[in-house]
From Swiss-Prot:
Name used for this protein in its record: Endonuclease V
Site residues by UniProt (Interaction with target DNA): 107
Residues annotated as binding Mg(2+): 72, 137
Gene3D superfamilies: archaeoglobus fulgidus dsm 4304 superfamily
Domain of life assignment: Archaea
Primary location recorded for the protein, binned into one broad class: cytoplasm
Chain's role: DNA repair enzyme involved in the repair of deaminated bases. Selectively cleaves double-stranded DNA at the second phosphodiester bond 3' to a deoxyinosine leaving behind the intact lesion on the nicked DNA.
UniProt organism field: Halobacterium salinarum (strain ATCC 700922 / JCM 11081 / NRC-1) (Halobacterium halobium)
Lineage, broadest ranks: Archaea, Methanobacteriati, Methanobacteriota, Stenosarchaea group, Halobacteria
Alphabetical keyword list: Cytoplasm, DNA damage, DNA repair, Endonuclease, Hydrolase, Magnesium, Metal-binding, Nuclease
Location within or outside the cell: Cytoplasm
Catalytic activity: Endonucleolytic cleavage at apurinic or apyrimidinic sites to products with a 5'-phosphate
Enzyme class, UniProt record, top EC level: hydrolase
Length: 264
């Protein structure tokens, strides 16, 4: 993969105000509408792909099948950020790539792209395949300045991207999330006064990808899905749900998480 907007690379030495300003510049360039040829049917998985056995395996629908790349991060000795990228085509893992970078930026909510982004760029730049979609463990538009990690990376490479987070960074659910939700439920996340987006704008969804049969005794929390770049909020939820197969997490980031664990 090739970086298209190098001016948005995480730069060393920026203070938090400069980082926030850079994120606003990225959000101004980001496209939160659909600009791709993807559908849930084209990227959907009937069964969870295997990580090792499928690597390099043949596909059933040929080269025309979309390439979906999952991205996840881990840390080594609290000093190095490690990023894992796993490319899937038509249910088979076709490539994996890793990147790393020093942890030079402290943890600040909303500024994770400057802490972890260099490792992500390193991993994605190592891929020989060109992704049709990035599925990033982290936020996209559900972000104080509409520029979470998925947006930052999507704009940097100008590739359709979605963010999948396990907790809600900001925004207000359109309906209560206190009680366990049935599988398949979606609740819109609307912009509020903690965000740069217009109040009430739908910036993503709480997506209940899976649920236990008796959620009153044991339940699964929803995912928080948001567009990163060149994908709308509704389509982002559609695409992520299509790749969740038998697990809560979408297959691309689930496999990237497993690979990241192997690297640390």
């Amino acid at each position: 993969m090739r970086v298209v907007r190098p001016e948005f690379r995480p730069a060393p030495g920026l203070d938090t105000d400069a980082m926030a300003s850079r994120q606003r510049d990225i959000a101004a360039v980001a496209d939160f509408a659909d600009d791709h040829g993807l559908t849930p049917e084209r990227i959907g998985l009937d069964e969870p792909p295997g990580e090792q056995a499928a690597l390099g395996g043949a596909t059933t629908s040929g080269e025309a099948a979309p390439v979906v790349v999952g991205v996840d991060q881990a840390f080594r000795d609290d000093e190095v950020s490690v990023s894992a990228a796993v490319a899937i085509r038509d249910g088979a893992v076709i490539e994996r790539a890793a990147g790393n970078a020093p942890l030079d930026v402290p943890y600040v909510p909303g500024l994770l792209a400057f802490r972890e982004g260099s490792a992500v760029i390193d991993a994605l730049s190592s891929l020989s395949v060109e992704p049709d979609l990035l599925v990033v463990d982290g936020s996209g538009r559900i972000h104080y300045r509409q520029a979470g990690l998925a947006t930052h990376v999507g704009v940097l490479f100008d590739v359709p991207a979605v963010g999948v987070a396990k907790s809600l960074l900001c925004g207000t659910p359109a309906a209560a999330l206190a009680d366990p939700l049935p599988a398949g439920t979606r609740v819109a996340i609307e912009a509020d006064d903690s965000m740069d987006a217009p109040d009430g704008a739908v910036v993503g969804y709480a997506l209940q990808s899976r649920q236990y049969p008796t959620p009153e005794t044991r339940h699964i929390n929803p995912l928080y899905v948001s567009p990163g770049h060149r994908v709308s909020a509704g389509t982002a939820a559609d695409l992520v749900e299509a790749t969740c197969t038998q697990y809560k997490l979408p297959a691309p980031t689930r496999l990237a998480d497993q690979y990241a664990a192997d690297l640390t």
